[in-house]
Structure formats: C-alpha cells, structure tokens
Amino acid sequence: MRLIATAALVGVMLHAAPSVLAKQPTVVDVPNGPAFVKLPGRKEVNARSGQDLFDNTVLRTSKPGRMQIKLSSGRQFRMGGNALLQLKNSTVKLQRGALIGWIQPGLKNRQPFTIQTRLATASIQGTTVFIELDDDKLKVFSWEGEVKVATTSGESYTLQSGEQLLVELNQPTITWSPPVKIKEAEATRRLTKSRLINGFATPMDTLQDIERELGVKALDRS
C-alpha cells in the first residue's frame, strides 16, 4: 500500500512538474538605482539581479535608475528614468517613462511583443522598439524591424527601421501624424548616448542587427 501511494505521489509530482518549473519573468540586471519591484500583494522592495517576478508585478525606476527584465516568453526589455509599468502575461503595460524592448533574433514561430500605453499599443514584429511616455509626448521609435502601432482613437501605423511616431500631448487636441524617418546623425546620437542601450552587463541581443540596419555604431561592447 505504501509503495502504491508513493508511486501515485511521484506521478502527481511529475504531472505537475511542467507548471511548477515554468519559467518566471526575471530581473536580469540593475546597473543603477533607484529601481523597485512590487510583487502582487507585497510591499515594494529594491530590485536586484536574479529576482523572480510574477504576473501583475509592478516595476518602477527613478532617475538615474534603470533595469533589464526577461519575460517568461523570452522577450526582454530595459526601463529607465521615471518609469512605471506592470507585467500582464506576456504584455508590458507602460504607464510612464522610457522603455526599449526586443525579441531575440532567430526565434522560430515568434509571436509579437506587445507594449501598451494609455494612448496606443505597440506590437514588435521585427526585433527592437523604443517607447517614451511622459506628460508632454508619446514617442515610438523602431530601432530595427517592423513595429505596428494601434491607437486608442482608432488609427493604425506601421513603422520600419529608423522610423519614429511622435505625438505631442500638451495640445488641446491630440493629433496623430504618420511616422517619419530620422536622420542618420540623430540615430547615431541616440545609439551612442542612450542609457538603455549602453552600460548594462551585456549588450542587447539585437544590437548588431540595429547597427547593421541603420549603419551606425553603439558604444556598448561589454
């Protein structure tokens, strides 16, 4: 009887193993604080590398804080400045601040990486997008590949590498305009100065793709 019970218990454990061992979102790197994590039902604590996260976790940084997160889907993003966001399944809900997100190159059957704001949702089809939201503006910039943007007011746009969608929010009426290609000099400036691209423990997976696509070089060669 004991042998049967033990075997049954092992069977239950093996059956449950896939869900128990499922990958959790994780804090990958925290180059600078202040950076904070608030797990569901818990108090806010300082973010630390290797920390496991869960659905509905709230992440926050204050200047000069920044950190890198890897989701259970394998998508990654970096956030910084006065940023605030929530993890919701495989979607990132950005309430304010700056974020750069990417899909690892070479993945087969990869699904889009979705980042939501109160004004629009950006869906990464290619590999890398930068989003910044504050009281004055919403900026969506495709570093590499295709990014689809759907606004809450019904507009739809598709950005290609080097294109930017910029919306001024300090106007009586929010007006959306088609994305525009930024100049090479501006792309170089952003790539070399960005605190979300440079200064982390390891370079972004898509950095070489960005450099090849835009013909510019970053400083980060960690």
Question: What would you call each of these model-derived segments?
Answer:
Residues N32-A35, P64-M67, T127-T128, V147:
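Generic short beta-strand segments
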Residues K38-R42, G106-Q111, L133, T151:
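Flexible, membrane-facing loop/turn or short amphipathic-helix motifs
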Residues L59-A122, V140-V149:
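Short, small-residue-rich packing micro-motifs
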Residues T121-T127, D134:
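Internal catalytic-core helix/loop-beta-alpha segment
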